[in-house]
Amino acid sequence: IPNGLDISRAAPLLCAGITTYSPLRTWNVGPGTRVGVIGLGGLGHMAVKLAVGLGANVTILSRSKNKETDALELGAHRLLDTSDTEAMQHALNGFDVILDTVPVRHDINPYIPLLDIDGTLVVVGQLGLLEEQFTVPMIMGRRRIAGSMIGGIAETQEMLNFCARQNILPDCEMIRMDQINEAFERLERSDVRYRFVIDMSTL
């Protein structure tokens, strides 16, 4: 871990950080790339910070308009309300890469037409079956659905060095060992911004 990175906040970089950094690098995200991020949780908030750090134009895609303040505070340039039919229509062909960080089964069909020609939607959050896919938008726009997991040791080190240079760290809440059960209950309520870190000195 590079000097200058807060150890307590660096821990989630080895999971959420590399999980989102790897696809951003694989799909050549850089200055001017139009990136959408579905989901604003542990993975999503890191995707925003890293994509902004790489120079991308970043939009959070969410059904919850009330997440807009959080999205902007994390560095996103805007929030697209995916429940707004007119807003979704205006966003067609508007993204080069979309990172889907949602961890539960959901319909990704509405997001495919948001990709520009040769655009890619990368699934990093959901393990399991996808909903049935309507293939016309993929065929007509040469759009792709891909998946990505974590990176190797070299890419993880690259990510850590990048975060140290850009001063990028996850938003964390430190908890004691005796708070673990409470933390699990809060996770079930989505009551965490955005990662818990256990203080092992409290063992």
Regions found by a protein language model. Give the residues of each.
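Short glycine-/small-residue-rich Rossmann-like dinucleotide-binding loops
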Residues: 102-103, 125-126, 202
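Adenosine-nucleotide cofactor-binding segment
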Residues: 31-40, 52-110
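N-terminal Rossmann-fold NAD(P) dinucleotide-binding loop
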Residues: 44-45
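Helix-to-beta-strand junctions that scaffold the AdoMet/dcAdoMet cofactor pocket
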Residues: 115-116
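Rossmann-fold dehydrogenase core element
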Residues: 120-122, 133-173
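NAD(P)H dinucleotide-binding glycine-rich loop of Rossmann-like/cofactor-binding domains
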Residues: 1-38
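Residues in the short beta-alpha loop(s) of Rossmann-like NAD(P)-binding domains
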Residues: 64, 127, 151
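C-terminal hydrophobic helical "lid"/dimerization subdomain
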Residues: 153-203
